[in-house]
Amino acid sequence: MKLIIFTGLALLLTVSLIDVEAQNEGACLPRGSVCTTNHAGCCSKLSCDCYRRFEKGVEKGQKCWCIPTGLRYSKEKE
């Protein structure tokens, strides 16, 4: 009986450690991912750049994306 309990606990611990390790490996956000709530989550050589959105002069919030560091987008002149 003790062997079954010990084996079950060891298996649970192993599965938990594997799950935590898998989460840590894929922790960074790739290029083009939304980073509005996680500004520091972009992968290396990427930065989280934010833009305020407006519709008909009314602010509709802020949107952020992971883009290459130093890259800037600008509004096209109409």
Curated annotation (Swiss-Prot):
Recorded GO CC terms: extracellular region
Keywords: Disulfide bond, Secreted, Signal, Toxin
Propeptide stretch(es), residue numbers: 23-26
UniProt KW Secreted keyword: yes
Tissue-wise expression: Expressed by the venom gland.
Annotated family: Belongs to the neurotoxin 19 (CSTX) family. 07 (U7-Lctx) subfamily.
UniProt protein name: U7-lycotoxin-Ls1a
Pfam families, alphabetized: Toxin_35
Major site of localization recorded for this protein: secreted
Cell compartment(s), UniProt: Secreted
Signal peptide: 1-22
InterPro entries assigned: Spider_toxin_CSTX_knottin (IPR019553)
Post-translational modification: Contains 4 disulfide bonds.
Lineage top rank: taxon: Eukaryota
Single GO molecular function: toxin activity
